[in-house]
From Swiss-Prot:
The keyword Nuclease does not apply. InterPro entries: Pantoate_hydroxy_MeTrfase (IPR003700), Pyrv/PenolPyrv_kinase-like_dom (IPR015813), Pyrv_kinase-like_dom_sf (IPR040442). Catalyzes the reversible reaction in which hydroxymethyl group from 5,10-methylenetetrahydrofolate is transferred onto alpha-ketoisovalerate to form ketopantoate. Binds 1 Mg(2+) ion per subunit. Pfam families: Pantoate_transf (PF02548). 3-methyl-2-oxobutanoate binds at D52, S53, D91, K121. SUPFAM superfamilies: Phosphoenolpyruvate/pyruvate domain. It comes from Deinococcus radiodurans (strain ATCC 13939 / DSM 20539 / JCM 16871 / CCUG 27074 / LMG 4051 / NBRC 15346 / NCIMB 9279 / VKM B-1422 / R1). Belongs to the PanB family. GO terms for biological process: pantothenate biosynthetic process. This is 3-methyl-2-oxobutanoate hydroxymethyltransferase.
Length: 284
């Protein structure tokens, strides 16, 4: 018997009061392609984020800065095809919402129209970003905010380092999250900040907080697909947890395949097709 179709989370489902009453934090994971999206939806996550982290983990860049709007749309389309019934958020990449509200609106609408996403995400809480959040939200484009460590502008923050550990940084992070809520953001990502600060922010906001490296008291958590599955071997990141070791398994599987090819063990008879002798004889 076929299982019933999954019911996609709606925007009202993602509000803070409903989360606290249910007691179950939201689960978000990144995905960048069709198979990854299928895995995430089949696992029953609440939200999928097509993050501009694809620049690092998929495209091989050193940062997210080179990622373009075309990149995000291309990958967003693939993810939506793989996860038609999961709430989908797509990052607006660096430079697409910094030149004014008109440009930002045009880019956000393109993302929604061309990918089928349910919302967009943007980093920061400067007055310019808040203006964009305000206009998009008022015009029917749901926006997820992002404070704390912001990879798009990490160089200006002193690199990829924990934020909110001193008085000024903690206050900026708290005030930025509150300002994003007031501008209309339906949720705010808290990245790489002390757990106690994240708890305070979560208590202050009436919209959901989604943590990554921000402790257990956020209203939800997000991890990068490649970090979660251990697709890259090496030291485990502090803000992530490795639930599998697929990088090692992939390397070993490819090495096994290569060894069998070189030993003429693959393809075997089980992987080959046959033909009748009389058909072959006519070719000589």
């Amino acid at each position: 018997m076929a299982s019933p179709a999954r019911v996609k989370r709606s925007l009202p489902d993602l509000t803070h009061p409903e989360l606290t009453s249910s007691g179950a934090p939201l689960v978000m994971v990144t995905a960048y392609d069709y198979p990854g999206a299928r895995h995430a939806e089949a696992a029953g996550v609440d939200l999928i984020l097509v993050g501009d982290s694809l620049g690092n983990v998929v495209l091989g860049y050193d940062s997210t800065a080179p990622v373009t709007l075309a990149d995000m749309i291309h990958h967003g389309k693939a993810v939506r095809r793989g996860a038609p019934n999961t709430f989908l958020v797509v990052d607006l990449p660096f430079g697409t919402y910094h030149a004014g509200v008109t440009d930002a609106m045009r880019h956000a609408v393109r993302v929604i129209q061309e990918t089928g996403a349910d919302a967009v995400k943007m980093e920061g809480s400067t007055p310019e970003v808040l203006d964009v959040v305000r206009v998009l939200s008022r015009n029917g484009v749901p926006v997820m905010g992002h404070v704390g460590l912001m990879p798009q502008t990490a160089a200006a923050q002193g690199g990829l380092r924990v934020q909110g550990k001193d008085d000024d940084s903690a206050r900026r992070t708290l005030e930025g999250a509150v300002a994003l809520q007031e501008a209309g953001a339906f949720a705010v990502v808290l990245e790489a900040i002390p757990a106690r600060l994240a708890r305070l922010i979560s208590e202050r906001l009436s919209v959901a907080t989604i943590g990554i490296g921000a402790g257990v008291h956020c209203d939800g958590q997000v991890l990068v697909y490649h970090d979660l599955l251990g697709l890259y071997e090496g030291e485990e990141k502090k803000i992530a947890k490795r639930y599998a070791d697929l990088g090692r398994e992939a390397r070993e599987a490819i090495a096994h395949y290569a060894a069998e090819v070189r030993a003429r063990e693959f393809p075997s008879k089980d992987n080959s097709f046959v033909m009748k002798d009389e058909v072959l004889d006519k070719l000589y």
